[in-house]
């Protein structure tokens, strides 16, 4: 289609030439962490076939200012940014919010309270979610467990840790979590604990999957790639966290 194009990228500067997300089909691009956040320790993350470049930036209309290095020509499928944004805007409110939330996390920005989403979520799923209470310091789920569903924080706060128990994020009222494992069909890769006594709403895994199945292929593509991208960015961040209590 006129919105997608196979391209051969020979120079890293060409990656930033258009308002487009790039899906790698062959080759490797390297991202140094100092291009992402300030750190005195330097590590590099590889992006290869099956990964995307500038997807989060394109979806959120941010500057394409993360600097990649390529040592060999990179084969990509380029997808027009305006087409991607329109597809996501027309997605169901839950899928749209999942994508927006993931972009926020990729940029390591603090989640903001979202009362509009909360109202719509509570109204839309009032007969579907299961309520639960979790006491302070109790686990909500642990690494390796199969996903039960998406969790919405009605009251309280939680914190996330890596498999090595390095704490890396906190989430608060109106935030949600746990959707990544559902979308990527994997077991839990993080631990989540209650930071204080919490009231949670659990939206069953099958309901989330049903929402996703009704979306157009382009939205499904964005969903799978945005979580892959979040995982790659987390690997870059976690390389500085190992062993931190």
PLM features: residue spans?
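Cytosolic regulatory regions built on CNB/CRP/Popeye-like sensor folds
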Residues: 1-245
